Amino acid sequence: MLAGAAACQTAPPGTSAAAGPRVVLEEAEAWRSVASERDAVALDGLAERWRQALAAGRAANLSRRIAGEGELLDPEARLARGAPAPGSYRCRYVRPGGRKWVSSAPGFCYVGVEEGQLTLATELRGLRFGGYLWELKGGERLIFLGGAVPAGSRTPPAYGDNPSRDAAGLVERIGEFRYRLTLPEPAPGAGLTVVELVAAPRD
């Protein structure tokens, strides 16, 4: 089951962080010693990616769709206590920057804990991955670093083992028991995938 996939990973290996003055996500954080330069640059440029994606969507006459998502597609929406509690979540994703509206069917995500660090795994058609969450200073946001699950497999590669399958994003709380994971595409100028996570009712 993918719900436990993130917990099956070995701790991701350290790689060199991006150098230079391009720091948007606060001062140096622990995640930078793990993230690739490519992913650090993409995360540092997330505000501009949001601007470009929303502008492209509105230019494609998708303003009503964007507005209908409320806080999910409001890059300024962020609440304190950003870390999601361990457990199951209903989730789906949208991609706001294309010529056509892209929204996935609902699926499930799972937040766990391994050796004191939060893990996240998704089970969505076309978006299956698992990895670790790194809390930023202040506690309002977390960095996700993980890997996409290969076809025919149940477990994602550890972050850094296969750079072509690496995934990096930003987690924020946007409502009661509601979170957002924003995944910038690694290529410069590419779009965004925004995953909504809503805590599933407990039986």
Residue ranges and their predicted role:
Residues G4-A7:
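C-terminal motif of bacterial Sec signal peptides marking the signal peptidase cleavage site
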Residues Q9-P84:
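Amphipathic/hydrophobic helical signal segments and adjacent flexible N-terminal regions
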Residues R64-E71, Y159-D203:
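Edge beta-strand at a domain terminus
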Residues A80-L142:
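Mid-length scaffold segments of soluble, non-membrane domains
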Residues G98-G107, F144-L170:
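An anionic, turn-rich surface loop/hairpin at beta-sheet edges
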Residues E123-G130, G147-G152, L183-A190:
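Short, solvent-exposed aromatic-acidic interface loops
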Residues R128-E135, S153-A158, A190-E196:
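A short, polar/proline- and glycine-enriched secondary-structure boundary/capping micro-motif
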Residues K137-I143, L170, G175:
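Classic N-terminal secretory signal peptides
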